[in-house]
Amino acid sequence: MVKHYEVVEFDIKNKKVLSPRQSLTSDQEKALNSLPAIYVYRSSRTKQIYVGQTIHFKTRHNQHYDGNEEKFEEAKFDEVIVLFFERANGSSLDDIENQLITFFKADNPRNKPYKIINGTGGNEVTVYTDIEFIAYNVILPFWDDYLFTNGWAKDKQTKLRESALVKYSPLKTLTEDQSDLISRVVSDKKHNYVINGDAGTGKTVLLTHMVAELMKDKSKRICVIVQSNWEKTANEIFGIYGMKRNNLVVTTSTKFIKDAQQGEVFYDAVLIDESHRLFRDYRKGIASSWVGIYEGEFSQCKSHLEIIQKAVGSKGQIILMYDVLQSVRPSSITREMFADCTKDYKKEFLKTQFRIKTPVGKSYSSDDYINGIKYLLFKDTGLLESGYTQFDPNFNRDVFRDLSPDAYFGYFTDSPLTNAYQWIRTKGIYNPSDSNRVLAGYVEPWKMADGKDSSIKHWHEGDIHLRWNSSQEGWLNSTDADADEQIGSVYAVQGIGLMSRFSTN
């Protein structure tokens, strides 16, 4: 395989002297003094790593050790590698530096075994011409074939990409539309916003970037409200990327309200992820943690959102991530209540980032597939005309009529469970690195407690007997012996990015 990058290795002796591990060619000598490069320092003594970029490495190395950078003196680096690569320019340097910092931090959770001492995540990155070339010909092979092989990394990039620390990193590359949207919202402090986006449009990634942008002003107090099953992950994400400071609070809606009941809360900005899942005053089967929520000054409120709005008042900006098409529990805020609460908010829309591989000779696209699924599920609900989601009624129906072996969409009418299960097993044979799952709607009785007992089966068809997902959190990466024989419920995959889905009924 042709390599599109080269690595030059140095030991660092006498605190700062570069000692090449191989004889340098004249081209390498020239490159070290005049070409764009990425470099990574590492200390075997203090267990620290630093990632940087430059257009003249030797000059930059001397600058690091000129006595003005205390962290370099304390780190006691004893080696450095310099990466040269094709199509090097300002954009690709920013991209590689950004992604290496992200991957190193995900590879060293809680700064163990190595601490990444970069003060920031590098420069902001937007989509550029060579982004795919750099991703597949430089970043991926450099990480897997060099860093992983030579002990600089514990895990390969494919595994790290499944980590929430990478998926929702505030360092991920943004599209130009996403970057512009963040600028509009952050600069317009006089208005509250609803960021509308279907599943897979990058609402959570946008939220982490927006928090990073807001926190550039260290005088601002920021509150991020997330679902309870994501609170720990969100704290880890903001913590590992150096954003967990006294002016940032990550909490749940119920905890926020209880704090508000104890006294005045003041935030310059309150961002709420998955605001379609905020609770309403639904007393049936009310959780014990809700006791006292809809009382006192909040006794007339009908939802957690209404309480949050009242607590924040006009002092702070509220930014809501919303998907009108998602509604999981009867205790969630209704669409009508949400619309009423946000009637004076400005609305923004995210475009889908979903992509499909169109078979040769076919003309349908990912947009046709998404519009078709929306039409199938919501055509009689009025939601497609609500103004909260983007929908094209003139989508190409061929995506659902294609019967070729490589068709993107398919369904079974005979023995659907058996055929769906066999289908993912076959996919696994030809794609051994993939993790394939069968998902389903509420077709069979479901109890969370059943997940602890692998002998309890819920799905039966012929000789096949399968069970619902064993856990709610982290199910896609479950290590259960029968993980790929479990049927995933909506609760197991809610808010999780999926590469592909096959649901059976």
Task: Enumerate the predicted regions with their spans.
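Core RecA-like ATPase module of SF1/SF2 helicases and allied nucleic-acid translocases
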Residues: 201, 239-253, 257-269, 343-505
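Conserved short loop/helix modules at catalytic or binding sites
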Residues: 26-28, 55-99
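AAA+/P-loop NTPase substrate/partner-engagement loops
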Residues: 217-241, 251-260
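GIY-YIG nuclease catalytic motif and its immediate N-terminal context
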Residues: 1-55, 59, 91
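Hydrophobic positions on the alpha1 helix immediately C-terminal to the Walker A/P-loop
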Residues: 206, 210
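Signature of the SF2 helicase/ATPase Hel1-core->accessory helical subdomain module
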Residues: 272-353
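Hydrophobic anchor at the beta1->P-loop junction of P-loop NTPases
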Residues: 195
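N-terminal pre-P-loop "Q-motif" helix
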Residues: 166-191
